[in-house]
Amino acid sequence: MIWVTSDFHFGHEKEFLWRPRGFESWQEAAEQIIKNYNEVVEWDDTVYILGDCVLKNDDFGLECLKRLKGNKFLAFGNHDTDMRLSAYTIEQIFCDIQFGYRIKYGKYSFWMCHHPMKMGNYKEKRPVWNLSGHTHQKDRFENAADGIYNVSLDAHDNYPVSIDEIVKDIKKYHYDNQIIQPRCEKCVYEMITCHSSDTDGKCEKYKRDPPDGGYYG
């Protein structure tokens, strides 16, 4: 399984960060974030961590990262300094470290990086969305008008989010906001052309040739 997350901020002592996340201290924040992460991620999963891992130049943050399961890939953020990147490399915490990553998943293409980046064709049949963090917004669709989906811990109850859940979220966003005009609900969720104005929830195309997957399963 593929997971995406960002903005652990391990060792960040400032209350303005950990208090809004529902914690009483930065130590509690670190322990709960690690617990949540390891509850859902398996050792053979792939995890894209989109920056701002640690906030102190000591062993605390590194030890936190070592406790996280999965094959971890880092898209570095503004707090991932050269010194910290060097430490990540020496300790072999990540499989790879880059500015960003692009992956294709089904009909979607995702550009993943730390800072939000406006995408030009996120409304198209084969959309490209930016997965990013940095802003610490709680609304994962705060910048959806620019094709940006927020994967930071703040927007996902301090858990990483799976790529399947992201796709499900985006499909529902398209439907709820009528970015693709709804006729047959099945086609809208699947982002395919509807060939009927039937109101029974299915068009003839869907009945004849149902698409794989889909919000309704």
Describe the residue ranges of each PLM region.
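A general structural motif
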Residues: 44, 69-71, 107, 126-127
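A short, conserved beta-to-alpha structural element at the edge of catalytic cores
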Residues: 24-40, 70-90, 154-172
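Active-site neighborhood of phospho(di)ester-bond hydrolases with catalytic His/Asp-centered motifs
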Residues: 5-6, 47-52, 72-78, 112-113, ...
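N-terminal active-site segment of His-dependent metallophosphoesterases
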Residues: 1-61, 151, 155
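Metal-dependent catalytic neighborhoods of phosphoester/phosphodiester hydrolases
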Residues: 50-67, 76, 81-96, 121-125, ...
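Cysteine-centered metal-binding/redox modules
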Residues: 179-217
